[in-house]
Amino acid sequence: MVKRSDKVGEQIHKIISELLIKGLKDPRIGFLTITGVKMTPDLRQATVYFTVHGSDEDKKNSEAGLNSAKGYIRKEIGQALKMRFVPEVLFKYDTSLDYGQHIESILKEIGATDDGEQS
């Protein structure tokens, strides 16, 4: 059984992704991807996870651009979803991809060490 919060999160993910393609013109927002949306059970808060392809400076600038567009994004969500309460939107950088790359590099190091020992 799918929870309502999951369905609403998927819809918000779709709306924000479309806004990034069509609606947001902030030059600080770089090439970013919305990786997920987590809703609170009462549907009052949506935490939007994103990744940025670029440097740490690009990450900071993109987060600042997203935070400055919160009001516009929330208004668009409200118009699209027709909910009694429009959830507050919080943006968080998704560190899971960075962590995955870190683990992958460690595994490659271990593999290179094992290959050296076997020779």
Swiss-Prot record:
<dbReference type="InterPro" id="IPR023799">
    <property type="entry name" value="RbfA_dom_sf"/>
</dbReference>
<dbReference type="GO" id="GO:0043024">
    <property type="term" value="F:ribosomal small subunit binding"/>
</dbReference>
<comment type="function">
    <text>One of several proteins that assist in the late maturation steps of the functional core of the 30S ribosomal subunit. Associates with free 30S ribosomal subunits (but not with 30S subunits that are part of 70S ribosomes or polysomes). Required for efficient processing of 16S rRNA. May interact with the 5'-terminal helix region of 16S rRNA.</text>
</comment>
<comment type="subunit">
    <text>Monomer. Binds 30S ribosomal subunits, but not 50S ribosomal subunits or 70S ribosomes.</text>
</comment>
<keyword id="KW-0690">Ribosome biogenesis</keyword>
<comment type="similarity">
    <text>Belongs to the RbfA family.</text>
</comment>
<dbReference type="Pfam" id="PF02033">
    <property type="entry name" value="RBFA"/>
</dbReference>
<dbReference type="InterPro" id="IPR020053">
    <property type="entry name" value="Ribosome-bd_factorA_CS"/>
</dbReference>
<dbReference type="GO" id="GO:0005829">
    <property type="term" value="C:cytosol"/>
</dbReference>
<dbReference type="InterPro" id="IPR015946">
    <property type="entry name" value="KH_dom-like_a/b"/>
</dbReference>
<protein>
    <recommendedName>
        <fullName>Ribosome-binding factor A</fullName>
    </recommendedName>
</protein>
<dbReference type="GO" id="GO:0030490">
    <property type="term" value="P:maturation of SSU-rRNA"/>
</dbReference>
<keyword id="KW-0963">Cytoplasm</keyword>
<dbReference type="InterPro" id="IPR000238">
    <property type="entry name" value="RbfA"/>
</dbReference>
